[in-house]
Amino acid sequence: FSKENSISIAINSILDKIYKLDDESFNNQTLIKFYESVKRRSEDIVTSQGRSALINELYERFFSKAFPLTTSKLGIVYTPIEIVDFINHSTNEILKDEFNVKLEDKNVHILDPFTGTGTFIARLLQTEIIRKENITYKYKNELHANEIVLLAYYIAGINIESTYQDIIKPNNYEKF
């Protein structure tokens, strides 16, 4: 996945440059500590669910520290995974009870209008609300996400694509 996605390629290129810096030329202790913390935490993550949680936490922390006014204006907040799962499952139940359809059914389009880092869609794929045999059709045709914050938009793309790739494990890359 990371070799095919253009955003992932760009981010990895930047990270490679950071890795090559030696400690003498990199004297910002706060950034070094943050980077080392991220590196330590990410080394043990092997699932897309774990990556999603780390991405969300880092994104919110980064924005709240680097751009507090933007965070406040745009309402950038991390929604805990448990709340995301509750909302996704509740929506599916309401659709079944009130409209006799499920989120996985054909012609039921799913729109996340303020997707942030793509957690709602990633979790929708991970929690099997959409069964594996229906995921490819839904992914290619009926999942939609919008975001006005460019960094979040790129992260959402990576998050959703990597989640899909982990579930389907195809030999070829599928862009979201």
Model-derived features with residue positions:
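Long recognition/docking surfaces used for binding and targeting
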Residues: 1-67
